[in-house]
Amino acid sequence: MKTAVIIGGGLGGLFTGAILSKEGFKVTVLEKNTTAGGGLQNFNRFGMKFDTGMHVIGGMHRGGNIYRICKYLGIIDKVSLKEVDNNCTDSLYFSEDKTTYCIGKGKEGFIDSLSEHFPEERDNLKKYVDAVLGLTEEVNLFHLRPSSDIFPSHSTDFFLAADAFIAKYITNPKLRSVVAYMNPLYGGVGDESPAYIHAIISSLYLQGTYRFVGGSDSFADLLVSVIEANGGTVNVNEGVEWVEVNNRHVDCVRSCKGNSYKADYFISAIHPCTLFTLMPENAFPKAYRTRLNSIPNSYSAFSVYIKLKPNAFPYINHSEYYMTKYDEIWNFGKPSKAWPLGFLFMTPPEINQGKYADKALITSPMLFEDVIKWEDTTVGKRGVDYETWKDEKTQHLLNRVEELHPGFTACVDKINAASPLTIRDYYGTKEGSMCGFSKDYKNIPLSQVPVVTKVDNLILTGQNNSLPGFCGVPLTAINTAEAILGRNYILHRINEITND
Protein backbone atom coordinates (compact mmCIF):
# COMPACT_ATOMS: atom_id res chain seq x y z
CA MET A 1 0.00 0.00 0.00
CA LYS A 2 1.33 3.41 -0.99
CA THR A 3 1.56 5.99 1.78
CA ALA A 4 1.12 9.76 1.89
CA VAL A 5 1.71 12.30 4.65
CA ILE A 6 -0.17 15.57 4.30
CA ILE A 7 1.14 18.71 5.98
CA GLY A 8 -1.92 20.70 7.05
CA GLY A 9 -5.49 19.59 7.54
CA GLY A 10 -7.32 22.47 5.89
CA LEU A 11 -9.82 22.08 3.05
CA GLY A 12 -7.06 21.27 0.55
CA GLY A 13 -5.35 18.76 2.79
CA LEU A 14 -8.58 16.98 3.67
CA PHE A 15 -9.90 16.81 0.10
CA THR A 16 -6.55 15.55 -1.19
CA GLY A 17 -6.35 13.05 1.66
CA ALA A 18 -9.89 11.83 1.05
CA ILE A 19 -9.25 11.35 -2.68
CA LEU A 20 -5.97 9.48 -2.17
CA SER A 21 -7.39 7.32 0.61
CA LYS A 22 -10.32 6.37 -1.63
CA GLU A 23 -7.80 5.30 -4.26
CA GLY A 24 -5.98 2.96 -1.88
CA PHE A 25 -3.40 5.15 -0.17
CA LYS A 26 -2.72 5.04 3.54
CA VAL A 27 -2.96 8.73 4.44
CA THR A 28 -1.72 10.58 7.51
CA VAL A 29 -2.79 14.22 7.90
CA LEU A 30 -0.84 16.38 10.37
CA GLU A 31 -2.77 19.45 11.53
CA LYS A 32 -1.44 22.07 13.97
CA ASN A 33 -4.81 23.22 15.31
CA THR A 34 -7.16 21.46 17.72
CA THR A 35 -9.53 20.65 14.86
CA ALA A 36 -9.02 19.98 11.16
CA GLY A 37 -10.78 21.90 8.41
CA GLY A 38 -8.97 25.21 7.87
CA GLY A 39 -11.69 27.59 6.68
CA LEU A 40 -14.26 24.97 7.72
CA GLN A 41 -13.22 25.26 11.37
CA ASN A 42 -15.55 26.56 14.05
CA PHE A 43 -14.96 28.12 17.42
CA ASN A 44 -17.22 28.23 20.46
CA ARG A 45 -18.14 31.48 22.19
CA PHE A 46 -21.05 32.43 24.40
CA GLY A 47 -22.34 28.85 24.37
CA MET A 48 -22.72 28.68 20.58
CA LYS A 49 -20.69 27.66 17.55
CA PHE A 50 -19.45 30.13 14.93
CA ASP A 51 -18.06 29.31 11.48
CA THR A 52 -14.75 30.99 10.65
CA GLY A 53 -15.09 30.80 6.87
CA MET A 54 -16.91 29.04 4.01
CA HIS A 55 -20.08 30.94 4.85
CA VAL A 56 -21.50 30.83 1.32
CA ILE A 57 -20.81 27.95 -1.05
CA GLY A 58 -21.55 27.06 -4.65
CA GLY A 59 -21.14 24.01 -6.86
CA MET A 60 -23.35 21.90 -4.59
CA HIS A 61 -26.48 21.78 -6.74
CA ARG A 62 -27.28 18.37 -8.24
CA GLY A 63 -24.76 17.85 -11.02
CA GLY A 64 -22.50 20.67 -9.81
CA ASN A 65 -18.76 20.08 -9.76
CA ILE A 66 -18.33 19.91 -5.98
CA TYR A 67 -21.56 17.92 -5.67
CA ARG A 68 -20.07 15.33 -8.03
CA ILE A 69 -16.75 15.21 -6.16
CA CYS A 70 -18.67 14.61 -2.93
CA LYS A 71 -20.72 11.90 -4.64
CA TYR A 72 -17.51 10.22 -5.79
CA LEU A 73 -16.24 10.31 -2.19
CA GLY A 74 -19.52 8.82 -0.96
CA ILE A 75 -20.51 11.69 1.33
CA ILE A 76 -23.03 13.72 -0.67
CA ASP A 77 -26.06 12.28 1.13
CA LYS A 78 -24.58 13.29 4.48
CA VAL A 79 -23.84 16.93 3.68
CA SER A 80 -26.22 19.23 5.57
CA LEU A 81 -27.01 22.30 3.47
CA LYS A 82 -29.66 24.99 3.25
CA GLU A 83 -30.35 26.65 -0.08
CA VAL A 84 -30.82 30.40 0.02
CA ASP A 85 -33.89 32.20 -1.33
CA ASN A 86 -34.42 31.69 -5.07
CA ASN A 87 -35.87 35.15 -5.61
CA CYS A 88 -33.00 36.79 -3.72
CA THR A 89 -29.81 34.74 -3.53
CA ASP A 90 -27.93 37.88 -2.46
CA SER A 91 -28.92 41.46 -1.78
CA LEU A 92 -26.65 44.44 -2.41
CA TYR A 93 -27.10 47.78 -0.71
CA PHE A 94 -25.22 50.87 -1.91
CA SER A 95 -25.14 53.60 0.72
CA GLU A 96 -24.30 56.20 -1.92
CA ASP A 97 -27.83 56.25 -3.32
CA LYS A 98 -29.64 54.05 -0.75
CA THR A 99 -30.48 51.45 -3.41
CA THR A 100 -30.92 47.73 -2.75
CA TYR A 101 -30.54 45.13 -5.49
CA CYS A 102 -31.83 41.58 -5.05
CA ILE A 103 -30.12 39.00 -7.25
CA GLY A 104 -32.36 36.23 -8.58
CA LYS A 105 -31.25 32.61 -8.96
CA GLY A 106 -30.06 31.24 -12.29
CA LYS A 107 -29.28 32.91 -15.58
CA GLU A 108 -32.80 34.24 -16.14
CA GLY A 109 -33.24 35.25 -12.51
CA PHE A 110 -29.98 37.19 -12.59
CA ILE A 111 -30.91 38.99 -15.81
CA ASP A 112 -34.51 39.71 -14.79
CA SER A 113 -33.66 41.00 -11.32
CA LEU A 114 -31.06 43.47 -12.57
CA SER A 115 -33.10 44.48 -15.62
CA GLU A 116 -35.71 45.84 -13.21
CA HIS A 117 -33.17 48.51 -12.23
CA PHE A 118 -31.42 48.80 -15.60
CA PRO A 119 -34.02 47.96 -18.29
CA GLU A 120 -31.86 49.44 -21.04
CA GLU A 121 -29.13 46.92 -20.15
CA ARG A 122 -31.19 43.72 -20.55
CA ASP A 123 -29.54 42.71 -23.82
CA ASN A 124 -26.11 43.55 -22.42
CA LEU A 125 -26.82 41.46 -19.33
CA LYS A 126 -27.68 38.50 -21.54
CA LYS A 127 -24.43 38.91 -23.46
CA TYR A 128 -22.51 39.31 -20.21
CA VAL A 129 -23.93 36.13 -18.65
CA ASP A 130 -23.28 34.19 -21.85
CA ALA A 131 -19.70 35.48 -21.84
CA VAL A 132 -19.26 34.46 -18.17
CA LEU A 133 -20.50 30.95 -18.88
CA GLY A 134 -18.40 30.84 -22.04
CA LEU A 135 -15.23 31.56 -20.09
CA THR A 136 -15.91 28.67 -17.72
CA GLU A 137 -16.17 26.37 -20.74
CA GLU A 138 -12.52 27.12 -21.41
CA VAL A 139 -11.56 25.54 -18.06
CA ASN A 140 -12.04 21.78 -18.42
CA LEU A 141 -11.25 21.06 -14.79
CA PHE A 142 -14.10 23.31 -13.65
CA HIS A 143 -16.50 21.00 -15.47
CA LEU A 144 -14.56 17.87 -14.39
CA ARG A 145 -13.76 17.11 -18.03
CA PRO A 146 -10.64 15.05 -18.80
CA SER A 147 -8.29 16.89 -21.12
CA SER A 148 -5.16 16.07 -23.07
CA ASP A 149 -4.29 19.72 -23.66
CA ILE A 150 -1.29 20.67 -21.56
CA PHE A 151 -1.33 24.17 -23.04
CA PRO A 152 -4.96 24.84 -24.03
CA SER A 153 -5.87 27.77 -26.24
CA HIS A 154 -8.03 30.55 -24.85
CA SER A 155 -10.18 33.42 -26.04
CA THR A 156 -9.16 37.06 -25.77
CA ASP A 157 -11.72 37.52 -22.96
CA PHE A 158 -9.85 34.94 -20.89
CA PHE A 159 -6.82 37.22 -20.65
CA LEU A 160 -8.68 40.41 -19.76
CA ALA A 161 -8.81 41.97 -16.32
CA ALA A 162 -12.11 41.19 -14.60
CA ASP A 163 -13.20 44.84 -14.52
CA ALA A 164 -12.31 45.29 -18.20
CA PHE A 165 -14.23 42.11 -19.05
CA ILE A 166 -17.33 43.47 -17.30
CA ALA A 167 -16.96 46.86 -19.00
CA LYS A 168 -16.76 45.14 -22.39
CA TYR A 169 -20.34 43.90 -22.01
CA ILE A 170 -22.00 46.30 -19.53
CA THR A 171 -22.38 50.01 -20.35
CA ASN A 172 -23.91 51.52 -17.19
CA PRO A 173 -21.17 52.32 -14.61
CA LYS A 174 -23.43 51.46 -11.67
CA LEU A 175 -24.40 48.10 -13.15
CA ARG A 176 -20.73 47.34 -13.74
CA SER A 177 -20.18 47.73 -10.01
CA VAL A 178 -23.23 45.67 -9.13
CA VAL A 179 -22.17 42.63 -11.17
CA ALA A 180 -18.69 42.85 -9.62
CA TYR A 181 -20.00 42.58 -6.05
CA MET A 182 -18.57 39.10 -5.47
CA ASN A 183 -14.98 40.11 -6.14
CA PRO A 184 -13.92 39.86 -2.44
CA LEU A 185 -14.64 36.12 -2.70
CA TYR A 186 -11.55 35.82 -4.90
CA GLY A 187 -9.52 38.75 -3.56
CA GLY A 188 -10.55 40.95 -6.46
CA VAL A 189 -8.48 44.00 -7.41
CA GLY A 190 -9.19 46.41 -10.27
CA ASP A 191 -6.96 46.14 -13.36
CA GLU A 192 -5.40 43.03 -11.84
CA SER A 193 -7.76 40.12 -11.15
CA PRO A 194 -8.18 37.89 -14.24
CA ALA A 195 -11.54 37.69 -15.98
CA TYR A 196 -11.61 33.88 -15.93
CA ILE A 197 -11.49 33.79 -12.12
CA HIS A 198 -14.35 36.29 -11.94
CA ALA A 199 -16.29 34.14 -14.40
CA ILE A 200 -15.74 30.91 -12.46
CA ILE A 201 -16.84 32.40 -9.13
CA SER A 202 -19.80 34.23 -10.69
CA SER A 203 -21.05 31.17 -12.57
CA LEU A 204 -20.90 29.09 -9.39
CA TYR A 205 -23.36 31.37 -7.65
CA LEU A 206 -25.54 31.81 -10.71
CA GLN A 207 -26.39 28.13 -10.33
CA GLY A 208 -27.43 28.33 -6.70
CA THR A 209 -26.00 29.28 -3.34
CA TYR A 210 -25.97 27.20 -0.18
CA ARG A 211 -25.08 27.46 3.48
CA PHE A 212 -23.90 24.79 5.87
CA VAL A 213 -26.51 24.04 8.51
CA GLY A 214 -25.33 23.85 12.11
CA GLY A 215 -21.69 24.59 11.32
CA SER A 216 -19.23 24.04 8.48
CA ASP A 217 -17.13 21.73 10.67
CA SER A 218 -19.61 18.95 9.89
CA PHE A 219 -18.28 18.93 6.33
CA ALA A 220 -14.69 18.70 7.55
CA ASP A 221 -15.79 15.75 9.69
CA LEU A 222 -17.16 14.01 6.58
CA LEU A 223 -13.83 14.37 4.78
CA VAL A 224 -12.02 13.06 7.86
CA SER A 225 -14.41 10.10 7.94
CA VAL A 226 -13.44 9.15 4.37
CA ILE A 227 -9.76 9.13 5.32
CA GLU A 228 -10.36 7.12 8.49
CA ALA A 229 -12.69 4.63 6.80
CA ASN A 230 -9.86 3.78 4.42
CA GLY A 231 -7.30 3.21 7.16
CA GLY A 232 -5.86 6.72 7.39
CA THR A 233 -5.52 9.09 10.32
CA VAL A 234 -5.96 12.81 10.90
CA ASN A 235 -3.75 13.94 13.78
CA VAL A 236 -4.73 17.29 15.28
CA ASN A 237 -2.52 19.33 17.62
CA GLU A 238 0.41 17.93 15.66
CA GLY A 239 1.83 20.54 13.34
CA VAL A 240 4.90 19.78 11.27
CA GLU A 241 8.03 21.52 12.54
CA TRP A 242 10.60 20.24 10.06
CA VAL A 243 10.74 18.64 6.62
CA GLU A 244 13.93 16.65 6.14
CA VAL A 245 15.09 16.93 2.52
CA ASN A 246 18.16 15.32 1.01
CA ASN A 247 19.06 15.28 -2.68
CA ARG A 248 15.69 16.82 -3.60
CA HIS A 249 13.82 14.03 -1.81
CA VAL A 250 11.82 14.21 1.43
CA ASP A 251 13.07 11.56 3.84
CA CYS A 252 10.64 12.35 6.65
CA VAL A 253 8.79 15.10 8.50
CA ARG A 254 9.03 15.79 12.22
CA SER A 255 6.06 17.03 14.21
CA CYS A 256 5.79 19.29 17.24
CA LYS A 257 5.25 16.15 19.32
CA GLY A 258 8.64 14.81 18.34
CA ASN A 259 7.23 12.15 16.03
CA SER A 260 8.89 11.32 12.73
CA TYR A 261 6.79 10.32 9.71
CA LYS A 262 8.02 8.60 6.56
CA ALA A 263 5.96 8.06 3.40
CA ASP A 264 6.13 7.49 -0.33
CA TYR A 265 4.68 10.94 -0.95
CA PHE A 266 4.48 14.15 1.06
CA ILE A 267 1.84 16.75 0.28
CA SER A 268 1.99 20.30 1.56
CA ALA A 269 -1.42 21.88 2.09
CA ILE A 270 0.00 24.98 3.79
CA HIS A 271 1.06 28.30 2.26
CA PRO A 272 4.21 27.68 0.19
CA CYS A 273 6.03 30.53 1.92
CA THR A 274 5.24 28.94 5.28
CA LEU A 275 6.52 25.62 3.95
CA PHE A 276 9.86 27.25 3.09
CA THR A 277 10.43 28.04 6.77
CA LEU A 278 10.16 24.34 7.64
CA MET A 279 12.80 23.16 5.15
CA PRO A 280 16.52 23.51 4.45
CA GLU A 281 17.27 26.50 2.22
CA ASN A 282 18.75 24.26 -0.45
CA ALA A 283 15.61 22.10 -0.70
CA PHE A 284 14.34 24.28 -3.55
CA PRO A 285 16.25 26.32 -6.12
CA LYS A 286 16.85 29.86 -4.92
CA ALA A 287 14.99 31.29 -7.92
CA TYR A 288 11.87 29.30 -6.98
CA ARG A 289 11.91 30.52 -3.38
CA THR A 290 12.52 34.10 -4.48
CA ARG A 291 9.70 33.97 -7.00
CA LEU A 292 7.11 32.62 -4.56
CA ASN A 293 8.19 34.96 -1.78
CA SER A 294 7.75 37.89 -4.17
CA ILE A 295 4.15 37.11 -5.18
CA PRO A 296 1.75 39.50 -3.43
CA ASN A 297 -0.92 37.93 -1.25
CA SER A 298 -4.61 38.72 -1.48
CA TYR A 299 -6.11 40.86 1.25
CA SER A 300 -7.42 39.63 4.56
CA ALA A 301 -10.59 40.36 6.54
CA PHE A 302 -11.97 41.66 9.81
CA SER A 303 -14.92 39.70 11.16
CA VAL A 304 -17.45 40.28 13.91
CA TYR A 305 -19.28 37.30 15.40
CA ILE A 306 -22.49 38.22 17.19
CA LYS A 307 -24.71 36.37 19.63
CA LEU A 308 -28.20 37.83 19.28
CA LYS A 309 -30.82 38.23 21.96
CA PRO A 310 -33.57 35.59 21.79
CA ASN A 311 -36.42 36.29 19.36
CA ALA A 312 -35.02 39.74 18.57
CA PHE A 313 -33.77 39.65 14.98
CA PRO A 314 -35.20 37.69 12.04
CA TYR A 315 -33.32 34.94 10.24
CA ILE A 316 -32.47 36.14 6.73
CA ASN A 317 -32.07 33.34 4.20
CA HIS A 318 -29.61 35.13 1.94
CA SER A 319 -26.42 37.13 2.29
CA GLU A 320 -26.48 40.90 2.36
CA TYR A 321 -23.64 42.93 0.88
CA TYR A 322 -23.14 46.54 1.93
CA MET A 323 -21.15 48.93 -0.24
CA THR A 324 -20.38 52.58 0.40
CA LYS A 325 -19.85 53.83 -3.16
CA TYR A 326 -20.17 52.28 -6.59
CA ASP A 327 -16.69 53.32 -7.67
CA GLU A 328 -15.10 51.65 -4.62
CA ILE A 329 -16.12 48.13 -5.64
CA TRP A 330 -12.62 47.23 -6.88
CA ASN A 331 -10.69 49.04 -4.14
CA PHE A 332 -10.76 46.52 -1.29
CA GLY A 333 -7.09 45.75 -1.93
CA LYS A 334 -6.01 49.39 -1.70
CA PRO A 335 -5.26 51.47 1.42
CA SER A 336 -8.23 53.60 2.44
CA LYS A 337 -9.04 55.87 5.36
CA ALA A 338 -12.74 55.24 4.76
CA TRP A 339 -12.83 51.64 6.08
CA PRO A 340 -15.09 49.77 5.72
CA LEU A 341 -15.66 50.18 1.99
CA GLY A 342 -18.09 47.29 2.24
CA PHE A 343 -18.93 44.10 4.08
CA LEU A 344 -20.94 40.89 4.10
CA PHE A 345 -23.73 40.52 6.66
CA MET A 346 -25.49 37.23 7.25
CA THR A 347 -27.40 35.16 9.79
CA PRO A 348 -25.99 31.59 9.69
CA PRO A 349 -28.67 28.86 9.86
CA GLU A 350 -29.07 26.46 12.74
CA ILE A 351 -30.50 22.96 12.62
CA ASN A 352 -34.31 23.37 12.60
CA GLN A 353 -33.89 27.08 11.92
CA GLY A 354 -36.90 29.09 13.02
CA LYS A 355 -38.17 32.59 12.38
CA TYR A 356 -35.49 34.31 14.46
CA ALA A 357 -31.70 34.23 14.16
CA ASP A 358 -29.50 33.17 17.07
CA LYS A 359 -26.36 34.75 15.67
CA ALA A 360 -25.03 37.03 12.97
CA LEU A 361 -21.77 37.58 11.12
CA ILE A 362 -20.19 40.71 9.67
CA THR A 363 -17.01 40.35 7.63
CA SER A 364 -15.19 43.10 5.77
CA PRO A 365 -12.04 43.00 3.62
CA MET A 366 -9.01 44.44 5.40
CA LEU A 367 -5.35 44.87 4.51
CA PHE A 368 -2.66 43.24 6.63
CA GLU A 369 -0.91 46.60 6.87
CA ASP A 370 -3.75 47.74 9.13
CA VAL A 371 -2.45 45.37 11.83
CA ILE A 372 1.25 45.51 10.99
CA LYS A 373 2.14 47.17 14.30
CA TRP A 374 1.07 44.00 16.12
CA GLU A 375 2.53 41.49 13.65
CA ASP A 376 5.01 40.10 16.19
CA THR A 377 2.31 39.30 18.75
CA THR A 378 0.47 36.04 19.36
CA VAL A 379 -3.14 35.11 20.09
CA GLY A 380 -4.35 36.54 23.40
CA LYS A 381 -1.18 38.57 23.91
CA ARG A 382 -1.56 41.53 21.59
CA GLY A 383 -2.07 44.24 24.21
CA VAL A 384 -4.68 46.76 25.30
CA ASP A 385 -4.21 49.08 22.32
CA TYR A 386 -5.00 46.20 19.96
CA GLU A 387 -8.20 45.39 21.83
CA THR A 388 -9.18 49.07 21.74
CA TRP A 389 -8.52 49.15 17.99
CA LYS A 390 -10.67 46.04 17.50
CA ASP A 391 -13.51 47.62 19.47
CA GLU A 392 -13.35 50.72 17.27
CA LYS A 393 -13.46 48.69 14.07
CA THR A 394 -16.33 46.61 15.42
CA GLN A 395 -18.31 49.74 16.18
CA HIS A 396 -17.69 51.08 12.65
CA LEU A 397 -19.26 47.92 11.24
CA LEU A 398 -22.18 47.92 13.68
CA ASN A 399 -22.96 51.51 12.74
CA ARG A 400 -23.14 50.50 9.08
CA VAL A 401 -25.39 47.51 9.84
CA GLU A 402 -27.75 49.96 11.55
CA GLU A 403 -28.16 51.58 8.15
CA LEU A 404 -29.27 48.22 6.74
CA HIS A 405 -31.34 47.23 9.76
CA PRO A 406 -32.33 50.11 12.06
CA GLY A 407 -32.43 48.87 15.64
CA PHE A 408 -29.99 46.01 15.04
CA THR A 409 -27.60 47.06 17.81
CA ALA A 410 -30.38 46.68 20.37
CA CYS A 411 -30.67 43.02 19.30
CA VAL A 412 -27.01 42.29 20.06
CA ASP A 413 -26.20 40.27 23.16
CA LYS A 414 -22.46 39.55 22.92
CA ILE A 415 -19.67 40.16 20.41
CA ASN A 416 -16.37 38.58 19.42
CA ALA A 417 -14.09 40.02 16.72
CA ALA A 418 -11.22 38.63 14.64
CA SER A 419 -8.59 40.50 12.64
CA PRO A 420 -6.12 39.54 9.90
CA LEU A 421 -3.75 38.48 12.68
CA THR A 422 -6.30 35.94 13.89
CA ILE A 423 -6.58 34.52 10.39
CA ARG A 424 -2.80 34.41 10.00
CA ASP A 425 -2.26 32.59 13.28
CA TYR A 426 -5.11 30.07 13.01
CA TYR A 427 -5.05 29.39 9.27
CA GLY A 428 -1.28 29.65 8.93
CA THR A 429 -1.62 31.87 5.86
CA LYS A 430 0.91 34.56 5.05
CA GLU A 431 -0.41 38.00 6.05
CA GLY A 432 -3.78 36.46 6.92
CA SER A 433 -4.56 36.20 3.22
CA MET A 434 -8.09 34.94 2.56
CA CYS A 435 -7.51 33.81 -1.03
CA GLY A 436 -3.79 33.02 -1.13
CA PHE A 437 -1.54 34.48 -3.78
CA SER A 438 -2.97 37.42 -5.73
CA LYS A 439 -3.70 36.68 -9.37
CA ASP A 440 -2.76 39.23 -12.04
CA TYR A 441 -4.05 39.02 -15.61
CA LYS A 442 -0.86 40.75 -16.79
CA ASN A 443 1.22 37.80 -15.56
CA ILE A 444 -1.05 34.81 -15.01
CA PRO A 445 1.81 32.23 -14.84
CA LEU A 446 3.43 34.08 -11.91
CA SER A 447 0.72 33.05 -9.46
CA GLN A 448 -0.12 29.73 -11.11
CA VAL A 449 2.09 27.62 -8.85
CA PRO A 450 2.36 24.04 -10.20
CA VAL A 451 1.48 21.30 -7.73
CA VAL A 452 4.64 19.38 -8.64
CA THR A 453 7.95 20.62 -7.25
CA LYS A 454 11.67 20.06 -7.75
CA VAL A 455 11.56 17.82 -4.67
CA ASP A 456 10.60 14.54 -6.32
CA ASN A 457 8.13 13.23 -3.71
CA LEU A 458 6.77 16.58 -2.47
CA ILE A 459 3.56 17.89 -4.03
CA LEU A 460 1.55 21.01 -3.24
CA THR A 461 -2.17 21.54 -2.82
CA GLY A 462 -4.49 24.32 -1.64
CA GLN A 463 -5.66 27.73 -2.77
CA ASN A 464 -2.21 29.08 -3.60
CA ASN A 465 -1.80 26.81 -6.60
CA SER A 466 -4.77 27.86 -8.70
CA LEU A 467 -8.25 28.88 -7.57
CA PRO A 468 -9.33 29.81 -4.03
CA GLY A 469 -12.40 28.88 -2.05
CA PHE A 470 -14.78 25.98 -1.65
CA CYS A 471 -14.72 25.30 -5.39
CA GLY A 472 -11.12 26.01 -6.33
CA VAL A 473 -9.43 24.06 -3.54
CA PRO A 474 -11.16 20.70 -4.27
CA LEU A 475 -10.33 21.11 -7.97
CA THR A 476 -6.67 21.64 -7.08
CA ALA A 477 -6.86 18.54 -4.88
CA ILE A 478 -7.72 16.60 -8.04
CA ASN A 479 -4.62 18.02 -9.74
CA THR A 480 -2.51 17.02 -6.75
CA ALA A 481 -3.84 13.46 -6.68
CA GLU A 482 -3.36 13.13 -10.44
CA ALA A 483 0.26 14.25 -10.10
CA ILE A 484 0.70 10.91 -8.31
CA LEU A 485 -1.87 8.69 -10.03
CA GLY A 486 -1.67 10.01 -13.57
CA ARG A 487 -3.30 12.69 -15.71
CA ASN A 488 -7.12 12.46 -15.85
CA TYR A 489 -7.18 9.40 -13.54
CA ILE A 490 -9.37 11.00 -10.85
CA LEU A 491 -11.53 12.80 -13.41
CA HIS A 492 -12.28 9.50 -15.13
CA ARG A 493 -13.11 7.95 -11.75
CA ILE A 494 -15.46 10.81 -10.86
CA ASN A 495 -17.19 10.59 -14.21
CA GLU A 496 -17.57 6.80 -13.93
CA ILE A 497 -19.32 7.16 -10.60
CA THR A 498 -21.35 10.33 -11.16
CA ASN A 499 -22.45 10.27 -14.80
CA ASP A 500 -25.86 8.70 -14.21
Q: Where are these predicted regions, by residue range?
A:
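Active-site-proximal substrate-binding core of FAD-dependent oxidoreductases
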Residues: 486-500
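Mid-domain catalytic core of redox enzymes
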Residues: 211, 241-355
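N-terminal glycine-rich phosphate/pyrophosphate-binding loop and immediately adjacent elements
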Residues: 2-127
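C-terminal segments that line or cap access tunnels to active or ligand-binding sites in enzymes
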Residues: 311-418
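Rossmann-like flavin
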Residues: 96-192
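Helical element adjacent to the flavin cofactor pocket in flavoenzyme catalytic cores
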Residues: 199-250
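A glycine-rich dinucleotide-binding beta-alpha-beta segment and adjacent secondary-structure elements
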Residues: 174-186, 403-467
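A conserved FAD-binding loop/helix module that cradles the flavin
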Residues: 463-485
